[in-house]
From Swiss-Prot:
It is a multi-pass membrane protein. The gene is floA. The chain crosses the membrane at residues 8-28, 29-49. Found in functional membrane microdomains (FMM) that may be equivalent to eukaryotic membrane rafts. FMMs are highly dynamic and increase in number as cells age. Flotillins are thought to be important factors in membrane fluidity. It is found in: Cell membrane; Membrane raft. Its main location: membrane. Keywords: Cell membrane, Membrane, Transmembrane, Transmembrane helix. The keyword Metal-binding does not apply. One of its GO terms (cellular component) is membrane raft. Homooligomerizes. InterPro entries: FloA (IPR022853). This is Flotillin-like protein FloA.
Length: 327
């Protein structure tokens, strides 16, 4: 291989390597597309995006859409939002939709909403086309104790000014449910709700439930009303059952106390009977001592025996028994 041929090969290889690096760093097709769309983006700007690890197509393509829609944006705005972790394409689409619908929305506001985790495009679309939120059955109890179940449809429109920091759909549903329960509870009976369900809508809508939320409530419509259980009767039945159990417990307590008192009386009777038997056992000893001392004569003892025998005979005739006989 001659030196001239080697030089040509090295030069050719160097040119190919340079072109490969150049086309890698500089997206020529994208640059041509931007020029054709009337968007002035320099090649050095595209190279700078590559060096900052930014995909040029994710900046230039949304910029082309924005310029064609008549929105004045630049690459620095889109690139800074991209580097902050935002969705550039969705923000630009939201700006275009807001511009077409004559909704005032700046890029800074849209970028802040997007970085806050909200879907700014969906919010703009909801501002143009309100969303209907359907609640589950909400149960309330009228004054007569009858349960009334109501299902509501809430028509809301996104409030772009309150998207950042405003409460979501769950809060709206919870507030509407609270208002429905309160309104049903203020009715005398279930007939009042069935005859005039729009009363619930008017009462709940007048409370300003969209305060502090990301939505503006346009209307609240009662879609369905159903009658549930007789809660008042259930509560009365439960109360009666509880009262019965309490009365039974108190009666059982009194019965136990009566049984204990009866057993105590029996014990006292047996105690007294034992004392009588003990006293009777001392009688012969007292008689013997009286005979020895001369305080009790034989005739007196004979009379005592006659009286005792007469008493036993009378008790036998009367069907009674002396304490000694029972022992």
């Amino acid at each position: 291989m001659t030196p001239e041929l080697l030089t040509v090969l090295l030069i050719t290889g160097g040119i190919l390597i340079f072109l490969a690096i150049f086309f890698t760093l500089v997206p020529i097709p994208l640059w041509i597309s931007s020029l054709a769309a009337g968007v002035r983006v320099s090649i050095f700007t595209l190279v700078g995006m590559r060096l900052r690890r930014v995909t040029p197509s994710k900046i230039v393509n949304p910029l082309i859409k924005a310029v064609k829609a008549g929105i004045n944006l630049n690459t620095n705005q889109l690139e800074s939002h991209y580097l902050a972790g935002g969705n550039v394409d969705r923000v630009v689409n939201a700006l275009i939709a807001a511009h077409r619908a004559n909704i005032e929305l700046s890029f800074e506001r849209a970028a802040a909403i997007d970085l806050a985790g909200r879907n700014v495009l969906e919010a703009v679309q909801m501002s143009v086309n309100p969303k209907v939120i359907e609640t589950p059955f909400i149960a309330g109890v009228a004054m007569n104790g009858i349960e009334v179940k109501a299902k509501a449809r809430i028509t809301v429109r996104a409030n772009i000014d309150r998207l950042v920091g405003g409460a979501g759909e769950e809060t709206v549903i919870a507030r509407v449910g609270e208002g429905v329960i309160s309104t049903i509870g203020s009715c005398q009976d279930q007939k009042e709700v069935l005859e005039n369900p729009e009363m619930i809508s008017r009462t709940v809508l007048a409370k300003g439930l969209d305060s502090g939320t990301a939505f503006e409530i346009l209307s609240i419509d009662i879609a369905d009303v159903d009658i549930g259980k007789n809660i008042g009767a259930v509560l009365q039945t439960d109360q009666a059952e509880a009262d019965k159990n309490i009365a039974q417990a108190k009666a059982e307590e009194r019965r136990a106390m009566a049984i204990a008192s009866e057993q105590e009386m029996k014990s006292r009777v047996e105690e007294m009977r034992a004392k009588v038997v003990a006293a009777e056992a001392e009688v012969p000893l007292a008689i013997a001592e009286a005979l020895r001392d001369g305080n009790f004569s034989v005739m007196d003892y004979a009379n005592y025996l006659n009286v005792t025998a007469d008493t036993k005979m009378r008790q036998a005739i009367g069907g009674q028994s002396s304490p000694n006989d029972t022992q």
